[in-house]
Amino acid sequence: GKSMQLIEENDNKFKVLLDKYKYCRDKKLAVKYRQEAKSFLHRLNELLSNQLGLCKNEITFSDICIFPFVRQFAFVDYEWFLNCQLDNLNDWLQKFLNSELFKKVMQKHAIYEH
């Protein structure tokens, strides 16, 4: 269904552009990759215009799968991301970033040594 299509597009197209954008040393090329990836972000933003999740009016598997990649993309140049008129997507991102589960998962721990 729609959920698997989104996840496949994320994994097979968006993730490729994210990596090219994030690790690109050539500024002009990075901007090109960012623009190419932006169409996927706009689609996600549109999906969130009248519901809480990407596929339903609640957070589902697809949201959890796609969130880490949107987070990575946003933090390459967060100021740029905030100025992209992706308000629904940014609100969705903030809900994840502020969730207790995310805070627990991202806690820093001492390095385990045995």
PLM features: what roles do these ranges have?
Residues 1-39, 49-52:
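GST-like domain detector, emphasizing the conserved glutathione-binding G-site
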Residues 15, 41-45, 97:
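Structural signal for well-ordered, non-membrane alpha-helices
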Residues 18, 70, 102:
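Catalytic cores of transferase enzymes with a strong primary signal for eukaryotic protein kinases
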Residues 46-57, 100-106:
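Surface-exposed helix-capping loop/turn segments at secondary-structure junctions
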Residues 108-114:
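Long, charge-rich low-complexity segments
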